[in-house]
Amino acid sequence: MLRARLLVPLVRPALVHRLDRCYSTALGSRFRKSNAVRSELKFDFPDVPVKEELFVQETPDKPLKENKTHVSDEDIDSLFDSLMSDHKAAEATEQHKELPPAEQERPSGANTHTAPIKHDTKSPMEYLAKSKLTPHVSRQVAKAMAGSPTQLLLATPASHHISTPAYQNDLWKHVISTLNTSKFQIPDFNSLMTTIPVDIRAQFLPQIEEWISQRGVKPSAITYGQVMLGYAEDGNVEKVEERFRQMIDNNITPTVHTYAHRLKACDKRGDLKQAMEIFDDLKLAQQLYGIRPNQVIFTTLISTSLRNHKVELASQIFEYMKYASLETQPTAHTYNSLITASAIRSNTERALDLFEEMKQKSVANVRTYQSLILACLRQEKYHLKAWELLLELREQHSESFYSRHTLVVVFQAAAVTGDLVFLRSLYKQLCMSPETYPDAILTQLLMQAYARYDTRTKPVASSALRATWGRLYGGNAQEMMRGFLFPDIEGMVQLNEEHPGMIPPFLPTNTIESLSFDRKKIIAESRAIFQFLKNNKPQLLDNIAATDYLKAGARHRDFPEFLRRYNEVSVGAGEAEGAVISPSEMKTYSARQKKPQRYDLQTQFSPAPRSDAHFFIALNAVQADCIADASERDPNLNHPLRRLTPQEMTDRLEFSQDVWVERGKWRKSDAYKNKYRTEAQQISADYNFALKIINALAALKQLGEAAAILSATPATFNWKKHDLAFFHNVAQAFYHEEAMKQIHKAVSRSKHLDEVIRNPDSEKSAEFDVFSI
């Protein structure tokens, strides 16, 4: 099970649940019936009658078989050189030039760089007159901004969800440094704080509070509220609680917003214990000040619970919201948080239940569809459902479809379902203009698609997108693509010729249907794309993209190419010192992040210090390279291994031994301890590495070595039959008695370990740490 999580992090096998054990978020939820929950969360809200509902489980589809063929290195190198030749000529004629910094940061469509606000023709005073600034503050701000080519970004409710760009932060620093507050009153200070974007406000609050103290003016409830909001956004729980105590000491009555700020600070820090204590205080505040919790209070508490992986608690609070009162009915944001949590736990059935509730209440929005699509992508049997929801999203919310978040979801759907042809076509379209150039997230997903793509005989029929859209367009892939993202798709074929400095060297194709990928094309194109981005757009290649690039070499069974990539994207612990950036400094962008990305345009691609992510892929590559394709297998043999030359066997065995030694050294480093902070995490990581080295040695027919490692593993390793199935099959095929004996012993020991867990008083076996070598 642990191995499956590492090899396929986004797609788990479909689990068949019994209806009597499934959880439904319909009105008959068991959470509403829990007296313990009602007493824990109880406020003076009326009860609501209950109804019961059930849901239907879909049946999983059978996966198609993969058609694998071995590829020669000469063919790959030849194709790679042909792909890169046009770009080398373009560089020689200086057709490829870097964009100016201002244009590099400009967003549109898929690009997530944050751009300067276009200069308005209105005067600064006209612009500031519409803000919440008092006239006295507006005049000083206008004076400070005189001559500036860009306008100052002012806080709005919508801007709370957008990251303030660095240059706007500098502008605000300039404005604050030039203010003369000698005549400021409390309304002036309040308007100033309200106007500063909330995500950068905390850094200016000490100066503003000092000005208030020097002026000797008395802070109001609004003053404390804006100060607490700024510190809460920064996750500074101590500062927020200190200001709350000052409010009480100054006899200023707190409001529901005051408690919302306190909970928000806990949410930003992920402090669930403190949040629950504040929630208990809120119950007392209801009696003292007549404060009743609103949607924001409950939604923030749900968010904090989810940050701490307390999905059960979040669900209980959610159910209580629905039945407490009309004022506390869950919002779209609340539903979306629960759908996202269900996606993380691969509980797609519950996510679909929540979606049906939202449709009944007409509160489903674009974010709902995005979260639900990601939930469907976590289970293979719902992949087609994900594409159907994507079509529905485009029809229901066409005005909001072309956004960064939706584009990331489209790329994720294509990457997870292995629709490389569709994904690379979209990526190429985005490269047509600097306004829409792909970001690091989309580059990650492109590399993931190369790693996940199955070389099948009929890729069009195997595509989840075409299987779904074929019903609408009669299987015409060209018609499906036309206008999906941009209306001017007809010129896609000539992009390499028209934009040689911007378009990566994709394989040419006349139509989408004409491109059929095999291993040679996948390896050559992914290598060419990576080299192009490495030389021209290194800021788009983070650690995740490099890892997926490495997986593509391992997945498509070209061991020499994999070794080249392994040394290109990673270095050993000894080589890393002074040569590459430290792991803490490495940039890794997440598709789940809500705020736009900021890139250092001066960055260069650097190989990462090796860790378990690299070691696991390396051993998987050895095992995959030893397994024969269906066309290569000898029908007279009862094992799946292909015949290797003595030199190939030696090379792969030496590489596996090098990985073993290097991982042992890394295990003693601080990087290992920082990555796995608990004993359970360390045991899990060591277990997975032991399993992979055993399978690699078994694939190399080194059954005695594999059996020796298995026998030396600690007693804390809970070996299961399905984990050792590959080793068992090979050992059985070669009649290796010692290996069979050790497998039986390890599995029996695990059964004894299960008994020890159930009965702590039973005898515990001694432990020997094989990884201390």
Swiss-Prot record:
Binds to mitochondrial small subunit 15S rRNA. It holds the Pfam family PPR. This is Mitochondrial 15S rRNA processing factor CCM1. It comes from the Eukaryota. Involved in mitochondrial-nuclear incompatibility, a major determinant in reproductive isolation between species, through hybrid incompatibility of Ccm1 and its interacting partner 15S rRNA between yeast species. Keywords: Mitochondrion, mRNA processing, mRNA splicing, Repeat, Transit peptide. PPR repeats lie at residues 220-254, 255-285, 294-328, 331-365, 366-400. It is found in: Mitochondrion. Residues 89-106 have a biased composition (Basic and acidic residues). One of its GO terms (cellular component) is mitochondrion. Residues 89-122 are annotated as: Disordered. Residues 1-23 form a transit peptide. It comes from Yarrowia lipolytica (strain CLIB 122 / E 150) (Yeast). One of its GO terms (molecular function) is mRNA binding. One of its GO terms (biological process) is mRNA processing. The keyword Mitochondrion applies. Regulates mitochondrial small subunit maturation by controlling 15S rRNA 5'-end processing. Localizes to the 5' precursor of the 15S rRNA in a position that is subsequently occupied by mS47 in the mature yeast mtSSU. Uses structure and sequence-specific RNA recognition, binding to a single-stranded region of the precursor and specifically recognizing bases -6 to -1. The exchange of Ccm1 for mS47 is coupled to the irreversible removal of precursor rRNA that is accompanied by conformational changes of the mitoribosomal proteins uS5m and mS26. Belongs to the CCM1 family.
